[in-house]
A protein has these predicted regions:
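Gly/Pro-rich active-site loop or hairpin
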Residues: 43-47, 51, 72-141
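A structural motif corresponding to the C-terminal end of an alpha-helix
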Residues: 20-31, 57-60, 92-96, 129-142, ...
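Residue-level preference for long, well-ordered alpha-helices that form the structural scaffold
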Residues: 6-9, 13, 78, 82, ...
């Protein structure tokens, strides 16, 4: 949406998704919209971008994927304000639309728009923020997908870290 503004970008995204939904109507597949780091002209950092698309299209095949690193990078403080972040998400998007969580730590500082995933508990989000998200009554029963670096060699380490966070 370069040069057109956020509203125009959201409108164009909704139009494109409507075409995708129409062309795949017989397949019954769902499309998950994922929050972004709000890098440059990318849509999806502010929750209202996704909320506006869902509101415009009103299609049950559209769901939302919440990425913990992306939220942190976009400035949503999961450590100090998880309740506020979830409340804002609910107001802008609706928690009923949340289908899955990409679970990862992040290398960048809060609000720096850096899309660099990190091993669980080793990044700038930290264990307390991740523990809060993993165990929160509004999110704990959702599917969590690990999206950490070096999956081939580090998956066991990250699974162990998640188990430790879940046990507390």
């Amino acid at each position: 949406h370069l040069g057109s503004g956020e509203e125009a970008g959201v409108e164009r995204l909704a139009q494109s998704l409507q075409i995708c939904l129409e062309k795949t109507a017989d397949l019954g597949v769902k499309i998950a919209l994922e929050n972004t780091c709000a890098q440059g002209t990318c849509l999806g950092g502010p929750f209202w971008h996704i909320g506006k698309v869902l509101q415009k299209l009103q299609n049950p095949r559209l769901v939302v994927c919440f990425d913990s690193c992306h939220a942190h990078a976009a400035g949503h403080d999961l450590g100090e304000n998880l309740e506020g972040v979830l409340s804002d998400f609910d107001a802008q998007i609706g928690l009923e639309n949340l289908a899955v969580i990409h679970f990862n730590d992040g290398k960048g500082a809060l609000g720096k728009h850096l899309d660099r995933h990190e091993h669980i508990g080793e990044g700038q989000l930290g264990k307390a923020a991740l523990r809060g998200l993993l165990n929160h009554p509004k999110t704990r029963d959702l599917p969590f997908i690990l999206e950490t670096p070096e999956v081939e060699t580090q998956i066991a380490k990250n699974i162990a870290a998640v188990r430790e966070l879940r046990a507390v």
